[in-house]
Amino acid sequence: MKMIREMKIKYTVREAKPEEVDAEYLKKITSSDDTVKTFLDITDSGIELFSVVYLDSRNRIILKQIIEKGTVNQASPILREIFKIAIACDASSIICGHNHPSGNPEPSREDKEFTKELVKAGEILHIKVLDHIIISRDLETDRTSYYSFADKGGM
């Protein structure tokens, strides 16, 4: 005989007051520039951080989450974790971003391969991957630069 635990969750929906809503929540993403601004907080980290922005059907931010903290030269994000969160928050699409502490935003071979896997997994789950941004700050010029897979036709 097996015991099965059941749990009942009750949700109440109400309109949020303006002071209760995080400024990032429901911000609409309409361009790569909007996306880059969303990932600026990970630019100066000394280690690679892989972050995901989860969006509703109108491209408004539902959630932003750091998924993986890597070493100085690599992040190995987990597809399952990315999409588990997307399903849990009912995201229609996602935008991924990570930093390159080296100051060079050009994607590595691993970045390109991972992006292909990410898009393929999103297609299977009907969660669109809109972009994968690599952001970095040039240590000599102190300029922030980025690489957008969507802008470069890599999606």
How would you describe each model-predicted region?
Residues 20, 24-85:
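Glycine-rich, small/polar surface segments that engage phosphate groups of diverse ligands
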Residues 1-16, 25, 58, 72-155:
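Active-site-proximal loop/helix of nucleotide/amide-processing enzymes and allied scaffolds
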